[in-house]
């Protein structure tokens, strides 16, 4: 069963532009995860949210340590704070990811 990890982040200096966020994602995430998809979106001037879709809970748990290391680096590099995080199995979806 696919597994989702949702987070909300606070950017003290404001959420960067979409191009800057894409560059950040490419550096921090691309090629270094078993996630099927990672989606980031802006909700206001100082917050963004993210959704990571994993093939299974087991894989999400296996990558937890790696996610934590990347988060610490991102906090230091970008002056951001994790506001909330929720995880759970995907129960239904409209499309195949």
Positions of PLM-derived features:
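Short S/T/G/P-rich N-terminal loop/turn motif that feeds into the first structured element of a domain
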Residues: 1-49, 53-69, 76-97
């Amino acid at each position: 069963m696919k597994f989702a990890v949702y987070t909300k982040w606070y950017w003290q200096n404001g959420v960067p532009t979409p191009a800057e966020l894409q560059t950040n994602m490419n550096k921090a995430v691309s090629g270094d995860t078993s996630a099927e998809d990672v989606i980031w979106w802006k909700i206001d001037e100082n917050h963004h949210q993210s959704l990571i879709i994993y093939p299974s809970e087991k894989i999400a748990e296996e990558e937890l340590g790696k996610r934590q290391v990347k988060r610490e680096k991102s906090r230091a590099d970008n002056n951001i704070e994790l506001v909330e995080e929720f995880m759970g199995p995907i129960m239904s979806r409209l499309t195949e990811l």
